[in-house]
């Protein structure tokens, strides 16, 4: 079940607010300019989905995002617990960073934890199947896929070159709860 936990950026041990209600999550995130919606990810993708099959299954949703926001490219990230690069990729995404463009993800299976750092707060968003999350450009954030990642998400970009991160150099992510 999707969830949102809000912390002070000075007190990672004490949540200020928490909910698993999609409407409440959407209200909180809309207030900070972040788009959160529940879409339908109802295509059967199989055990190890191929990117082309995922894109074909959800082309209508991709086209909708492109029409609304003028995005230029998209791809699929799919991680499984047996991926030999899972630890290195987890560490890469766990460092706080920003992008010069929106970070848009549509989870078509599994889950992951997006953590946003703004307005002296940390917003931990547990994204699950059916969740669309769009984080505006330049918001510091990190992503935790867990120690045994199991998710597939469509990533949509402004930049045809895809995912380009700029590290903030802040180690704030080290103090906050992570996925198991």
UniProtKB/Swiss-Prot annotation:
Site positions (Important to generate the dianion): 105
Cofactor binding, note field: Binds 1 Fe(2+) cation per monomer. Binds 1 nickel ion per monomer.
Binding-site residues for Fe(2+), renumbered to this chain: 97, 99, 103, 141
Site (May play a role in metal incorporation in vivo): 96
Gene Ontology biological process: L-methionine salvage from methylthioadenosine; L-methionine salvage from S-adenosylmethionine
Reaction(s) catalysed (UniProt annotation): 1,2-dihydroxy-5-(methylsulfanyl)pent-1-en-3-one + O2 = 3-(methylsulfanyl)propanoate + CO + formate + 2 H(+); 1,2-dihydroxy-5-(methylsulfanyl)pent-1-en-3-one + O2 = 4-methylsulfanyl-2-oxobutanoate + formate + 2 H(+)
Iron is among the record's keywords: yes
GO function terms (MF aspect): acireductone dioxygenase (Ni2+-requiring) activity; acireductone dioxygenase [iron(II)-requiring] activity; iron ion binding; nickel cation binding
Keyword GTP-binding annotated: no
Superkingdom per UniProt: Bacteria
Pathway it works in: Amino-acid biosynthesis; L-methionine biosynthesis via salvage pathway; L-methionine from S-methyl-5-thio-alpha-D-ribose 1-phosphate: step 5/6
Catalytic activity, EC: 1.13.11.54, 1.13.11.53
PANTHER family in the record: ACIREDUCTONE DIOXYGENASE
HAMAP family: Salvage_MtnD
Function comment: Catalyzes 2 different reactions between oxygen and the acireductone 1,2-dihydroxy-3-keto-5-methylthiopentene (DHK-MTPene) depending upon the metal bound in the active site. Fe-containing acireductone dioxygenase (Fe-ARD) produces formate and 2-keto-4-methylthiobutyrate (KMTB), the alpha-ketoacid precursor of methionine in the methionine recycle pathway. Ni-containing acireductone dioxygenase (Ni-ARD) produces methylthiopropionate, carbon monoxide and formate, and does not lie on the methionine recycle pathway.
Family recorded in the similarity comment: Belongs to the acireductone dioxygenase (ARD) family.
Quaternary structure and partners: Monomer.
The protein, known as: Acireductone dioxygenase
Species in which this protein is naturally found: Yersinia pestis (strain Pestoides F)
